[in-house]
């Protein structure tokens, strides 16, 4: 049985999800072997008859919900104008998983993964219809001097691992395969900073959903069945004025962020300013909090005086991501903007759709 066939046959019990298939899938991914003993699947299928299970067709997502790693490379590129460029990118879509497996085998414990996304205009040019229901160009927010800017970007690569050499090697091979088809507009190498702190000293990603909740908040479901298992991702590159930030007393920094610096505890609502970062980036709908999955990474060049945060947020719809930016840059209410923006400037901004892993391979045939 081929890997693709197995992935599409996921046995779901009414009393819970059978997870044994994941161990087989992980084995196949590690070894690269495209066949396996079907006795496990046969056994699970027979159990489904007696335990009220249903076999459903659920696309495998890309590695959107992978744990935060120690290193990452973010590459944003534009598609070149030649017709051959589009053809090359489409064919390349089928090679991403294989290249990732090949490089990952060098350090099996390195947790190497790659997520690939496409902008609205790139999707239309590369794949046409149908298209993801909520995919559109990045929307700018804010006013002059405090703006979430939109910058060119047709293709996103988010490469993660616990070692930078794995990220570097995979990025090298992926970009080599795209030679002549794209032009890189931004590339950032991010690193884990102590106990998952941002470059400004506060823990980042504290409120990230995990497990099933992460999948619920990040992966498209029945609302757009053709693209189920996909995700929307928004990226921004922020530069920080570290001198001005470090001139603030710790207590003042905590009021800007809305959390304590050392212990990473959220300030009580009675003392947390309404324009603190945590207050304005908490999104609710119909009285319920809507989470996004952040995988931000610090980056910098101390010799050049450059210190930054690469923001990357995944969600099942662009809506909470854009609401967050509106709260930050316009303010809630308008004028009550995120105080962190007095020390941080967004210099890039793009929105992409991340197709499921299954669909990504199928797109090569369009």
Predicted regions and their residues:
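Short, positively charged and aromatic/hydrophobic N-terminal segments
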Residues: 10-13, 20, 49
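Cationic, low-complexity basic patches in intrinsically disordered or flexible, solvent-exposed regions
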Residues: 6, 21, 30
């Amino acid at each position: 049985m081929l890997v693709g066939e197995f992935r599409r046959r996921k046995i779901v019990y009414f009393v819970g999800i059978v997870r044994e298939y994941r161990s087989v899938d992980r084995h196949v991914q590690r070894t690269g072997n495209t066949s396996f003993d079907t006795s496990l699947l046969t056994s699970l299928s027979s159990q489904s008859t007696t335990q009220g299970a249903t076999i459903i067709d659920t696309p495998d997502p890309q590695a959107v919900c992978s744990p935060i790693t120690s290193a990452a490379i973010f590459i944003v590129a534009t598609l070149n104008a030649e017709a051959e460029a589009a053809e090359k990118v489409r064919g390349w879509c089928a090679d991403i998983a294989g290249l990732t497996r090949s490089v990952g085998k060098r350090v099996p414990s390195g947790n190497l993964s790659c997520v690939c996304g496409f902008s609205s205009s790139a999707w239309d040019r590369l794949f046409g219809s149908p298209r993801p229901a909520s995919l559109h160009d990045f929307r700018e927010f804010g006013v002059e001097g405090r703006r979430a800017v939109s910058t060119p970007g047709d293709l996103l690569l988010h490469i993660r691992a616990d070692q930078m050499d794995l990220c570097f090697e995979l990025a090298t091979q992926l970009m080599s395969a795209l030679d002549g088809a794209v032009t890189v507009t931004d590339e950032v190498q991010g690193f884990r900073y102590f106990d998952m702190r941002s470059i400004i000293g506060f823990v980042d990603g504290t409120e990230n959903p995990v497990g099933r909740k992460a999948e619920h908040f990040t992966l498209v479901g029945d609302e757009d069945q053709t693209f189920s298992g996909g995700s929307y991702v928004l990226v921004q590159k922020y530069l920080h004025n570290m001198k001005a930030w470090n001139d603030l007393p710790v207590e003042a920094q905590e009021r800007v962020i809305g959390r304590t610096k050392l212990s990473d505890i959220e300030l009580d609502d009675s003392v947390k300013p309404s324009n603190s970062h945590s207050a304005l980036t908490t999104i609710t709908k119909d009285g319920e909090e809507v989470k996004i999955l952040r995988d931000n990474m610090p980056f910098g060049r101390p010799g050049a005086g450059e210190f930054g945060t690469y923001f990357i947020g995944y969600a099942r719809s662009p809506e909470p991501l854009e609401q967050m930016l509106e709260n930050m840059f316009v303010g809630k209410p308008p004028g009550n903007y995120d105080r962190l923006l007095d020390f941080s400037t967004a210099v890039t901004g793009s929105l992409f759709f991340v197709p499921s892993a299954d669909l990504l391979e199928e797109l090569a045939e369009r």
